[in-house]
Design a protein with these regions (language model features):
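General beta-strand structural signal in soluble alpha/beta enzymes
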Residues: 3, 29-32, 53-56, 111-112, ...
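Glycine-rich phosphate/diphosphate-binding loop of Rossmann-like nucleotide-binding domains
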Residues: 59, 63-147
Length: 265
């Protein structure tokens, strides 16, 4: 990979820059672009370019969170697809997580954000919108990505729920507090590292010359990551000897099966 820094925050400048350098590369990994600009930038580039374009803050996070939830629900006796999943904070990470959960088959995703346009974006994707109190009362699983330490008070935690408070360095509620308040399982952002996802996602896409990284490929990556976790782990260690190789293979298969392979004349 070649790191390229763009000293400009204008979405048009970023889009034009990436568009102009894209012929040099087999894929583009976008990083550290805030919402809502990240959505426009990725959508335009993904539509125009014939190589994979992926914003890691959205999709790398979403893949590892899905993997973590597959194991957390197993620990807690919940069925992910039948659970109500609450997403607190609908920025880049929260929106990416919401969309991937909906694609995976979770029927009830309810989100909350102070930004009305973020809530509208979730509604357009097929999710529901509510207040923070509504999300905390209804959700069997709560995922928080707000960047607001201490936002979730112990008295707001639903008994038996799964709570992933992912903001770093300080979460919306600490795992200890969530468990003391009655959560069946709780973790913070230190347990969920994007680096479990993006190496295999990009290596797999590049190996088969995929034109994009679609949801089937992301879900395949999440399933592979989840399988490698030890008995009491949410997700495996970054240093697990097989995880990146197996994620790569899973992504390759999903790309081939979903027909996003570049055909040469």
């Amino acid at each position: 990979g070649v790191p390229i820094l763009i000293q400009n925050r204008d979405p048009k400048v970023i889009i034009d820059t990436v568009r102009n350098i894209a012929p040099t590369f087999g894929a583009i990994k976008l990083e550290d672009i805030k919402a809502p600009e990240c959505f426009e930038i990725e959508d335009v580039l993904d539509a125009e370019l014939d190589i994979p374009v992926m914003h890691d803050d959205q999709h790398g996070t979403a893949v590892v969170v899905l993997a973590a939830l597959l194991n957390a629900t197993r620990f807690s006796g919940l069925m992910l697809k039948k659970s109500v999943v609450g997403v607190v904070g609908l920025g880049a990470a929260g929106m990416g997580i919401s969309k991937l959960l909906l694609s995976y088959g979770v029927k009830n995703v309810i989100g909350t954000d102070l930004d009305v346009t973020a809530c509208d974006r979730l509604s357009a994707a097929g999710g529901a919108v509510g207040s923070l109190d509504e999300v905390m009362k209804k959700a069997h699983i709560v995922i928080a990505t707000t960047g607001c330490p201490g936002l979730i008070k112990p008295e707001m935690v639903r008994k038996g729920s799964v709570v992933l408070a992912l903001s770093n360095p300080n979460p919306e509620i600490t795992p200890d507090l969530a468990l003391q308040a009655g959560a069946s399982f709780a973790a913070d952002g230190k347990s969920v590292n994007n680096a479990l996802a993006f190496p295999g996602l990009f290596r797999g896409a590049l190996n088969v010359r995929a034109t994009r990284i679609n949801n089937k490929m992301k879900i395949a990556a999440a399933l592979s990551i989840a399988r490698h976790a030890e008995e009491n782990e949410l997700v495996p260690s970054l240093l697990h000897p097989d995880v990146h190789k197996d994620v790569t293979a899973a992504v390759e298969r999903a790309a081939l099966e979903s027909g996003v392979i570049k055909h040469w004349d």
